Amino acid sequence: MSKHDKPLDFLWFIPTSGDGSYLGSDDLSRPADPGYFREIAQAADRLGYSGVLIPTGVACEESFILAANLAAYTEKLKFLVAIRPGVASPAYYARLASTLDRVSHGRLLLNIVVGGSAQELAGDGIFLPHDERYDHADEFFQVFNSLIETGKGDLDGKYIKAQGARLGLPPVQEPRPPLYFGGSSDAGIEFSAGITDKYLTWGEPPAQVAEKIVKVRAAAAKNGREVTFGIRLHFIVRETDEEAWADADRLISKLSDETIASAQEVFSKASDSVGQARMQALHNGRRDKLEVSPNLWAGIGLVRSGAGTALVGSPKTVAARLREYQALGIDTVIASGYPHLEEAYRLSELLFPEIGIDGPRNQIRSSFGAKQVFGGGGHGGNVKLVSGS
């Protein structure tokens, strides 16, 4: 079996700023609720997802605290949690990361978020220009990695000064929890090549993803390193292509042109992220040309910052598109879909069999080789068994 034939590592997403069935509308919306997050995490844990991404930002719940809570209600699920250089010291983040890895029994993944919104960064007390934020992050991780791998850290840097920093308790994972990172600028790619274990890209067309992978591999090779690759995508998978595209249209059916224009203006003014600019360039704020590559739909990015594209289609169609990314070197997918509880089930039931991922964990046999038929029954909602092959 070649590496391109191996099943992809699939993570799901916890929508900590809220969820819903329509973009840009309060109709059928769901507030940010810890109980709901727990439902999604427990479903992902059962359904074959290896982990969940917990987002970060002013509109989101704090990711380390939420991950610690969800770890208590799950068994195997890993948690991809944001570490924000500059928001706290390397020593403090080392203690957070080590403790969370210990209490979750080695289920922590770390997502480096340098930041792309000048307004949000200013609120966190960070005023460095775009490229300097990566210089700062490089010094940050010199101390962080030293602490978490050896228990000691010292640096007299331009941005970070640590004298006699110590970490008393090591993480479970050796030498440390894996570091993930996504950044499309040249500065971001150079930073990733020297620090991270897995480079993440948002869901751009395969040709653009291929260009990024070539750049990251070349930059990593200069540092004597190898980096693996993941992609962040939404999914709209239905039994037929026609059903999937109908639901894609439905997702943005309550969006007004004014809402789209307002969102795009905010994204353009608030962000200096190269990745965000690349997402916006796929659709240019227009809703009439949203299929930017076969089955790659940019409708979500009309009003959502960050990951703005979805793979749309039947299980066979979407599986074929995923194999195209896999052939480029992608081995990990961070997935989501609206609403996230229902779509976690739908993706595992429809797509996972097509891409070789095991289904629900701890599945109990319903009968001795009989087909399941759901019927009303005298007690309501019972399962009748019909024999057959």
UniProtKB/Swiss-Prot annotation:
Gene3D superfamilies: Luciferase-like domain. It catalyses: an alkanesulfonate + FMNH2 + O2 = an aldehyde + FMN + sulfite + H2O + 2 H(+). It comes from the Bacteria. Its EC number is 1.14.14.5. InterPro entries: Alkanesulphonate_mOase_FMN-dep, Luciferase-like_dom, Luciferase-like_sf, SsuD_RutA_monooxygenase. One of its GO terms (biological process) is alkanesulfonate catabolic process. GO terms for molecular function: alkanesulfonate monooxygenase activity. Keywords: Flavoprotein, FMN, Monooxygenase, Oxidoreductase. It is an enzyme of class 1 (oxidoreductase). Catalyzes the desulfonation of aliphatic sulfonates. Belongs to the SsuD family. PANTHER family: ALKANESULFONATE MONOOXYGENASE, ALKANESULFONATE MONOOXYGENASE-RELATED. This is Alkanesulfonate monooxygenase. It comes from Agrobacterium fabrum (strain C58 / ATCC 33970) (Agrobacterium tumefaciens (strain C58)).
